[in-house]
Amino acid sequence: MKPTTIFLMGPTASGKTDLAIQLRSSLPVEVISVDSALIYKGMDIGTAKPSKEELALAPHRLIDILDPSESYSAMNFRDDALREMADITAQGKIPLLVGGTMLYYKALIEGLSPLPSADENIRAELEQKAAQQGWAALHTELAKIDPMSAARINPSDSQRINRALEVFYITGKSLTELTEEKGEALPYDFVQFAIAPQDRHVLHERIEQRFHKMIELGFQEEVEKLYTRGDLNINLPSIRCVGYRQMWEYLQGDYDHEEMIFRGICATRQLAKRQLTWLRGWKTPIQWLDSLQPQQAKETVLRHLDSYQKG
């Protein structure tokens, strides 16, 4: 019999952390973060990282594990999450995976086909080509080889364009083809919940309020520390995180403070929309919870898990 794990998914600002803390007080669970922004050290305010008080109530694994100069893939996450899940189940507890990075959940459930390691010669050739023609030209080349990846990748995102082309030149297969080849399935039975307000306008309001609160808490100062380090740039995954990108561009002088706030809120709302789109198209059953009914949401999880474990 496979061990059980719980997935608590949902868009940004939906109340996942609060519910996770409530669940930990009632269930033998340990929390694993499923968030591609919370992995970075020194990025606390703009990622809405759980506070010290919240982490004391519900410690989260896989947060603060990387410097913002480093990259992290879905495959890295899968390896790390499986290790942490094994450790938790060995203690007789249930892994509770909490977060909104849907690609990480997908990688965990379905597995990933191994992608080739970086080839420095090919990367150098692509860099040289980009220096002559521009990354937009390489993005056009990618669109002919792998239209699905090209549609997901911004024409100015040099790192991801380079990687997608590199994979094709090494393997002769597109990144889309390779990622669709299934890897090893998840060795757990999983129960899935998604929390969100039933009214989309409530989520939009929460996102706007939270962004303004981040500004009050010192978000600009947090990004200024990263900006003045000198070794970070806007093409890094960390700085491309929602909110950080807009604040970075503001610090560069690309637009004024008011425009930065407007763009940051819009980008966060777009992220939430993408997360909800993922969830609505999810292939395996999800139990939906209402953010505005936290006690009812907790009781639903407890009841659902109890009936699931009884078979």
From Swiss-Prot:
ATP binds at G10, P11, T12, A13, S14, G15, K16, T17. Residues 35-38, 159-163, 240-245 are annotated as: Interaction with substrate tRNA. One of its GO terms (molecular function) is ATP binding. Substrate binds at T12, A13, S14, G15, K16, T17. The keyword Magnesium applies. One of its GO terms (biological process) is tRNA modification. Its cofactor is Mg(2+). Keywords: ATP-binding, Magnesium, Nucleotide-binding, Transferase, tRNA processing. The record marks T101, R123 as: Interaction with substrate tRNA. Its EC number is 2.5.1.75. It catalyses: adenosine(37) in tRNA + dimethylallyl diphosphate = N(6)-dimethylallyladenosine(37) in tRNA + diphosphate. Gene3D superfamilies: 1.10.20.140, P-loop containing nucleotide triphosphate hydrolases. Signal peptide: none annotated. Catalyzes the transfer of a dimethylallyl group onto the adenine at position 37 in tRNAs that read codons beginning with uridine, leading to the formation of N6-(dimethylallyl)adenosine (i(6)A). Belongs to the IPP transferase family. Monomer. NCBIfam families: miaA. This is tRNA dimethylallyltransferase. It comes from Haemophilus influenzae (strain PittEE).
